[in-house]
Amino acid sequence: MPPTNGQTAIIQSKTCPTPTTLPLVVAHGRPLPPLPSSHHVRVRVLAVGLNPTDHKMVTHFFMQDNTTGCDFCGIIEEVGSASALPLGLRVCGADFPYRPSNPYNGAFAEYAVADSRHLLQIPDAISNIQAAAIGAIGWGTAALAMSDPTALNLPGTPSKPDARSLPVLVYGGATATGIIAIQMLKRSGYIPIAVCSAQSAPLCISLGAVGTACYTSTTCVQDIKALANGQSIKHALDCITDPESTTVCLASLARIGGRYACLEAVSDACITRRSVAVKVVMGFEGQNFDVDLGHPVYSRKANPALHAVAAQWAAELQPLLNAGIIKTQPLEEIEGRFEGVIKALEMLQGGHIKGKKLVVNISS
């Protein structure tokens, strides 16, 4: 049962008792988040996965005293009346706590709340930290990039693959989102072409990429086009989103144009092709909440259609998870529970982690 005297959580605070590069502190006696709908459940958190958004949001959109953390694995201990899942089930998923109207919910806590329609049931063969690495931020972002009509608008799914076998460029193929996107695209009938380092190429190919191009190569664009085997590339997912990645993606798309989905705001100066439709994908749009960050690109209104997309993809991925097919980046477990989370986020922010997913056990 949830504690009656509040819970422990990592919150945003500029009054940290010890020096830290991030405005985060471990707080006790925090209120438990309420269930915002009859579809939501309360989960006792067992382990968490860390994402770049967890340090970027508290750095650029600081919200005093808000709880933090997205990806988690845990056990359902309370259910809403319309929950799709029962009590006692071990699940993984995510919340997006970085919004002003959501001060108490977040994965970096003893208890988190999530929409049951977006959770995955964890098979016994998958450990807590493996499940936390799967979470939902990566696959949820990839799902919206693929299926949002204003993003890549790709209709294929694992249960109904697209028979056209279209090539899809994934820049940053070895990132957490890139890795799951390659798998989702491959299972949905598409031909993923990954841009990554030479060291990450074997991993991307093993997950379903038809081939890789090295982002440091002077022939990167030519190599990408060669991997398309004569087909025009009309879809690109940019999991890095900087001037270099944007340039490569746009140059790789067909002369007649295409679609470019990215994960960060892009300078207008970088968008050099009017024939390319651009969408900055925010994974939190799948949660169907208003998110007002005071920024024209990152603020979004609740979107029921994208909430349905996320729910559809949870249903699509469950059989793959049951079969042991879904893979993540190699894991690096950081000790220390909540203090370990802050340490790990500082490692991630400092650029010390490449090609690994940081995970932390929370259960004592």
Swiss-Prot record:
Transmembrane segments: none annotated. Keywords: NADP, Nucleotide-binding, Oxidoreductase. The keyword Oxidoreductase applies. The keyword Protein transport does not apply. SUPFAM superfamilies: GroES-like (SSF50129), NAD(P)-binding Rossmann-fold domains (SSF51735). Gene3D superfamilies: Medium-chain alcohol dehydrogenases, catalytic domain (3.90.180.10), NAD(P)-binding Rossmann-like Domain (3.40.50.720). It catalyses: 7 malonyl-CoA + acetyl-CoA + 10 AH2 + 5 S-adenosyl-L-methionine + 2 H(+) = dehydroprobetaenone I + 10 A + 5 S-adenosyl-L-homocysteine + 7 CO2 + 8 CoA + 6 H2O. InterPro entries: ADH-like_N, GroES-like_sf, NAD(P)-bd_dom_sf, PKS_ER, Trans-enoyl_RdTase-like. Substrate binds at W139, G140, T141, A142, A143, L144, A145, M146, G283, F284, E285, G286, Q287. Its EC number is 1.-.-.-. It holds the Pfam family ADH_N. It is an enzyme of class 1 (oxidoreductase). NADP(+) binds at residues 53-56, 174-177, 197-200, 215, 263-264, 353-354. GO terms for molecular function: nucleotide binding; oxidoreductase activity, acting on NAD(P)H. Monomer. Trans-enoyl reductase; part of the gene cluster that mediates the biosynthesis of betaenones, phytotoxic polyketides involved in leaf spot disease in sugar beets. The first step of the pathway is the synthesis of dehydroprobetaenone I by the polyketide synthase bet1 and the enoyl reductase bet3 via condensation of one acetyl-CoA starter unit with 7 malonyl-CoA units and 5 methylations. The C-terminal reductase (R) domain of bet1 catalyzes the reductive release of the polyketide chain. Belongs to the zinc-containing alcohol dehydrogenase family. This is Trans-enoyl reductase bet3. It comes from Neocamarosporium betae (Beet black rot fungus). The lineage of its organism: Eukaryota, Fungi, Dikarya, Ascomycota, Pezizomycotina.
